[in-house]
């Protein structure tokens, strides 16, 4: 896996590329999404086995993310033509069917390399997931090995948690969900949380 240029708390590496959006090819840039949160997820290859389960799950929850002012973008090293062929394949045959999220082509592998998820020996991406805030700052990175898919619910929860901390200045404990107690991040005020939960 390459080291990449994606670092927590720093601006996310910008990119421009061709994506399949609503069944058509479209040039997109990360900077197009400034002012919104972005969940950028990499997956190994089209026409595989775990990948469609993740992509369909993210697509099926796209509106949940949009309600939070967040867009979801999928990326693999496949071409936009392969993405389109997979989208045009019915789900019952291992295809994706119509999607509610863009799939970005990274045929040069530069995006995977830049984000540090390129599996050099195979020329494919690990299952990297990056949460980028409305200012373009990278807030979260997770990278799974190839055989295990990611949780869309956890990605949604993380976006909600980062947005909450940005708005309220409090921090979110393990397993936090919207409506749960948070912690005031100083020694004295944090005792309110700890006395209630211990």
Swiss-Prot record:
Modified residues (Phosphothreonine): 182
Active-site feature positions: 51 (cysteine sulfenic acid (-soh) intermediate)
Modified residues (N6-acetyllysine): 196
Highest taxon of source: Eukaryota
Catalytic activity: a hydroperoxide + [thioredoxin]-dithiol = an alcohol + [thioredoxin]-disulfide + H2O
Keywords, sorted A to Z: Acetylation, Antioxidant, Cytoplasm, Disulfide bond, Oxidoreductase, Peroxidase, Phosphoprotein, Redox-active center
Enzyme's top EC category: oxidoreductase
One Pfam short name: 1-cysPrx_C
SUPFAM superfamilies reported for this sequence: Thioredoxin-like
PTM-bearing positions, type N-acetylalanine: 2
Residue ranges of every copy of the Thioredoxin domain listed in the record: 6-164
Main location: cytoplasm
Post-translational modification: The enzyme can be inactivated by further oxidation of the cysteine sulfenic acid (C(P)-SOH) to sulphinic acid (C(P)-SO2H) instead of its condensation to a disulfide bond. It can be reactivated by forming a transient disulfide bond with sulfiredoxin SRXN1, which reduces the cysteine sulfinic acid in an ATP- and Mg-dependent manner. Acetylation increases resistance to transition to high molecular-mass complexes. Deacetylated by HDAC6 which decreases reducing activity.
Subunit structure: Homodimer; disulfide-linked, upon oxidation. 5 homodimers assemble to form a ring-like decamer. Interacts with TIPIN.
Protein family (similarity comment): Belongs to the peroxiredoxin family. AhpC/Prx1 subfamily.
Listed name of the protein: Peroxiredoxin-2
Gene symbol of the encoding locus: Prdx2
